[in-house]
């Protein structure tokens, strides 16, 4: 959930109550998913995740499949979509890396849909904003691919390798748009740092 000020009054309890009492918490944040420039299959994955439809263990159990429900990356009990992509200790390492990189404090929302709704924060600088908007998609894509590699191929990246994979995807996706003149990954990291 993201509580935004009204245009005239700022933050008021009444506006917060309206956000809390509205069913679904508001409109679907489709611009956070479909208006950001990155590979279409990643956009489809993000859209599916925002709708709560990716095939994690809890969703497969709801469909009648009997399987062990544990999170591959953190080896904890109960693989849900929100746990895997937001709250898993393995995912937390990636999210914390981003928040330190951009020099911000952040409280992770409960659900993926709420994250996309809150992620529309304005960074001020256009190039930083373009990078900022693709980050949740990139992190979730890395985590999903790692989960699938562990589940179906028996391969496992350590957290440092996963962080490097994240940066590689981020740099490649941003370079493919032609919006940036960064010659290497270190230039991108340095530019977005606080």
Report the location of each language-model feature:
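Charged boundary/loop elements
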Residues: 1-194
